[in-house]
Amino acid sequence: MAETFAFDCAGERLVALADRALFWPARRRLVIADLHLGKGDAFRHAGIAVPRGGTRHDLDRLSELVCAHDASSLWILGDMLHGALVDTHWRAAWDAFRARHASLGIVVVAGNHDRALARAELAIEIEPRHRLDAPFVFAHVRERVAGAISISGHEHPVVRLPALGGRVPCFRVADEAIVLPAFSAFTGGHPVAAREGWIACVNGHLLPHLARGARSV
């Protein structure tokens, strides 16, 4: 198993990354979904004890990916935030990330948890529903646009691999759509059938089981 897996989709080369991200080399674009900044803060605000440091860890992972792939842009496919702006811990971590990557263009397609996104002033461009960049349409929830392959998040796909530790995050890869795993490590998951096309993220490596519409390169 490798840390990256390149495959062909609609005539474009895409690269799945073991740290739950997708890279489009032709655009130098890093794509993630479901970052859920502040989720731990929201849980603690509600009286639920969870460890601190999750947001900073996720943003450190993201920073490493931006640098490793020399990305010129970052697209976040929804649920960048997790609910209301209840704490400042995540904000300090985000501001540090943004300062570190000041020239990085960041587009966020708003998700169902992003109600506070517009007033958060995070130095990002917000797309309210989806954005078309042929041959793909980028959205939070899978979008149907004629002639375009949907790339989305929201579902937090996981696949059950008992021999490799049980349920693991995965990319869901079909003829007409790619669903990204949740980038945040602090999320649940929606099961993908073993017979479907997927690329599993297993302990820093990738295990592909491709659908017909995607071809490894």
What are these regions (language model features)?
Residues 1-217:
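Extended recognition/assembly regions associated with phosphoester-bond processing machinery
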